[in-house]
Amino acid sequence: MKSLWDEKEANLYKDDLGMRVYTSQLLGRDSSLVLHGGGNTSVKIVEQNIFGRDQNLLYVKGSGWDLETIDRPGFAPVKLEHLIKLADLEKLSDPQMVNELRSNMTNASAPTPSVEAILHATLPYQFVDHTHADAIVTITNTANGKQKIKDIYGDRLIIIDYIMPGFDLARLCAKQFYKQVNENTEGMILLNHGLFTFADTAKEAYENMIRLVDEAESYIKACDAWDYVLPERKNNALDIRVVAELRQKISTIAGQPMILSVSQKENMQRFASMENLESLANKAQPRQITLFERNDSPCWVRILTFTLMNIKLTLKCTQRTRKTAKLCSTLRLE
């Protein structure tokens, strides 16, 4: 993974929120880090209130905003001290948390803050970046994933066991951060979820993210995960009637119309041609995969679904996965 940082572009942004916008967009440009609407970023800023008094604010990405295109209006300013106090509570329901976040914003027209706003607030750095990097989740989703992370990064990452995003996760991270942090700490990994990096400059937080993910990608490459020679094929064309029939069957199972598009990217064909494809497709994927075979030309389906209770859901054309199918809104054959 390569850094997209450009000094000329960066110089166009003159303040901390501007730098937050810039590096957020850099993260959003790489779909192996975040998909549309995924991930979140924040910056801590001191601003004057209407009485001319300084107040500490957390500008955090608004829920649903896309990092690739986010701009200043996409960040919600929330009172930092209140967020930190919330992390000390024993319990906080989701409706209560949303109410506390919204009622402590300093801009009523701002979007609803990310559900991970409290987590961002508890990290003692000005800039915090969070992604769902493919390489990171690929490793953590394998057997002994936690140990693999330790082998790769040593004591440079704080490791948090999986828990659903929200108040409980923020509270756990707030406690574990101070238990595990050391002079070598560069980030925090949430197993089966993603990676946090942080620093007191936007550039350093971003560069930390890129470097740590690059290490994960290098580890995967060293395991020969993608070193497969694509067999020569005379004709890779997929009959449009086959596509239509496949879409119809999947839509029937899903109980709603589904959209299916075809791509023949080399890395996808290479993966689809592996002899142990079905085994690979059912473990460690950061996105959901289903296998279909058509004569001599296997293909695979990436399904954009929800992650539910630490289970990466996979849609297959069988009756037993009907509930999973209903969670899907888009099906893409890539």
What kind of region is each of these model predictions?
Residues 1-334:
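Glycine-rich flexible loops
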